[in-house]
């Protein structure tokens, strides 16, 4: 990376100077609006995402693999509200002027990059998890620790993307101490590609493949259920017997005493059953045809988990769509200013797209409440207990 300064061209916190929105000497109308809006936004992010974390931790019905990633996403939003938003609002109230130390600015930039990247990487991790769950469900169900490892990987990669900022990348000659931004244009391009422009297409591709595979699985399951339905005769003639439908007796001799006295056949060895005096065309009673219940119970348990996960997946396109709607304008403006220093971008536009990106942190709990009945009922229960 080079050391070309991006001062005045904006970073993840807009990076505006005193000339942009105000003089920095008083709390004008724009500063008051920023203060009120910032306090409301911080309160909504803290309340909503805390409710998500408490609900998943306290209710077993919400403790699914998908919701573990949602908790990680909520944790990123909570950290953003605690570590980034207060200083961002402070800068906005001052009209874009940074009055604190440059070292604090660098820490703020690094936290902003890391948490924004963590949000995107968590959504990518959900797409990977859902893709594996749909394409190789049997192997997926046996790997209970994979979700935690994937979540840990998202945070480590996010920290790696943000690390250059705290390692001195922002310490460039002639730095303006009144502007808090990313100073290196090469790093702005690098972080934008790693944090947004590379993972987002991959995430969308995985979601497309996941929902396509899910539709195929449901179609195959529907066809299989119909093929197992009892067949009714379409015309005169002897009824067609279905060996899976109840007991049919055809010229069978009486059962042996061992069969009459034994309450279940599952305790008999297979050799006893193979010596049954039935003719090849006859069928034994239901008891003799009983199968061990363990595989069936496992299949039913897997079906229940799959059904719950399918319900959880319905909210994911809305979460991803809201994220892209809120953050795409910011990253487009962000990388445009880095690649085209001569291009003029209004400071007010920079401020608007930055606010829009941060608003996304407050949207996810609202989305869960509207589009997920399980979250909605648990939210109500949790709020009643806390009030």
Swiss-Prot record:
Glycosylated residues in this chain: 3
Keyword Translocase among UniProt keywords: no
GO cellular component: axon; axon terminus; cell cortex; cytoplasm; cytoplasmic side of plasma membrane; dendrite; dendrite terminus; dendritic microtubule
GO MF, one example: dopamine binding
Membrane topology: Multi-pass membrane protein
Tissue: Central nervous system: hypothalamus, thalamus, olfactory bulb, and frontal cortex.
Entry binding sites for Na(+): 77, 119
Pfam family, any one: 7tm_1
An annotated GO BP: response to thyroid hormone
Keywords assigned: Biological rhythms, Cell membrane, Disulfide bond, G-protein coupled receptor, Glycoprotein, Lipoprotein, Membrane, Metal-binding, Palmitate, Receptor, Sodium, Transducer, Transmembrane, Transmembrane helix, Ubl conjugation
PTM section of the record: Polyubiquitinated by the BCR(KLHL12) E3 ubiquitin ligase complex: polyubiquitination does not lead to degradation of DRD4 protein.
Main location: membrane
Transmembrane segments: 35-57, 68-90, 107-128, 147-170, 187-208, 315-337, 347-369
Disulfide bonds: 105-180, 340-343
Extracellular topological domain: 1-34, 91-106, 171-186, 338-346
S-palmitoyl cysteine lipid attachment residues: 387
Assembly and interaction partners: Forms homo- and heterooligomers with DRD2. D4.7 allele exhibits higher affinity for homodimers compared to DRD2 heterodimers, while alleles D42. and 4.4 have similar affinities for both. The interaction with DRD2 may modulate agonist-induced downstream signaling. Interacts with CLIC6. Interacts with GPRASP1. May interact with ADORA2A. Interacts with KLHL12.
Family in the record: Belongs to the G-protein coupled receptor 1 family.
Function: Dopamine receptor responsible for neuronal signaling in the mesolimbic system of the brain, an area of the brain that regulates emotion and complex behavior. Activated by dopamine, but also by epinephrine and norepinephrine, and by numerous synthetic agonists and drugs. Agonist binding triggers signaling via G proteins that inhibit adenylyl cyclase. Modulates the circadian rhythm of contrast sensitivity by regulating the rhythmic expression of NPAS2 in the retinal ganglion cells.
Name of the molecule in the record: D(4) dopamine receptor
Lineage: Eukaryota, Metazoa, Chordata, Craniata, Vertebrata
Gene name, Swiss-Prot/TrEMBL: Drd4
């Amino acid at each position: 990376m080079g050391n070309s300064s991006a001062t005045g061209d904006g970073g993840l916190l807009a990076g505006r100077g005193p000339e942009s929105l105000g003089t920095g000497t008083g709390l004008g109308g724009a500063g008051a609006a920023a203060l009120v809006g910032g306090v409301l936004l911080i309160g909504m992010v803290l309340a909503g995402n805390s409710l998500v974390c408490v609900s998943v931790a306290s209710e077993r019905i919400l403790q699914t693999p998908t919701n573990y990633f949602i908790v990680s996403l909520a944790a990123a939003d909570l950290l953003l509200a605690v570590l980034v938003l207060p200083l961002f609002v402070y800068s906005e109230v001052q009209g874009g002027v940074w009055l604190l130390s440059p070292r604090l600015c660098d820490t703020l930039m690094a936290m902003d990059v890391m948490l924004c990247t963590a949000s995107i990487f968590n959504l990518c991790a959900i797409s990977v998890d859902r893709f594996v769950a749909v394409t190789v469900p049997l192997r997926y169900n046996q790997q209970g620790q994979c979700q935690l490892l994937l979540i840990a990987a998202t945070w480590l990669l996010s920290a790696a993307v943000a690390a250059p900022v705290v390692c001195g990348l922002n310490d460039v000659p002639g730095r303006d101490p009144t502007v808090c931004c990313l100073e290196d244009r090469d790093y702005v391009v690098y972080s934008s590609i790693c944090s947004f422009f590379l993972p987002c297409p991959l995430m969308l591709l995985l979601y497309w493949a996941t929902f396509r595979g899910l539709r195929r699985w449901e179609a195959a399951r529907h066809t299989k259920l119909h093929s197992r339905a009892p067949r009714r005769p379409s015309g005169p003639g002897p009824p067609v017997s279905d060996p899976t439908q109840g007991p049919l007796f055809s010229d069978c001799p009486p059962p042996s005493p061992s069969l009459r006295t034994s309450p279940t056949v599952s305790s008999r060895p297979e050799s006893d059953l193979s010596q049954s005096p039935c003719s090849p065309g006859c069928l034994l009673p239901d008891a003799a045809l009983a199968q061990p219940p363990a595989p069936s119970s496992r299949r039913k348990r897997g079906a229940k988990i799959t059904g719950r996960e399918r319900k959880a997946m319905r909210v994911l396109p809305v979460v991803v769509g809201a994220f892209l709607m809120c953050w795409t304008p910011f990253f487009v403006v962000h990388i445009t200013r880095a690649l085209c220093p001569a291009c003029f971008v209004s400071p007010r536009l920079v401020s608007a797209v930055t606010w829009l990106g941060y608003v996304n942190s407050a949207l996810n709990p609202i989305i869960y409440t509207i589009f997920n009945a399980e979250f909605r009922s648990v939210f109500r229960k949790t709020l009643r207990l806390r009030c």
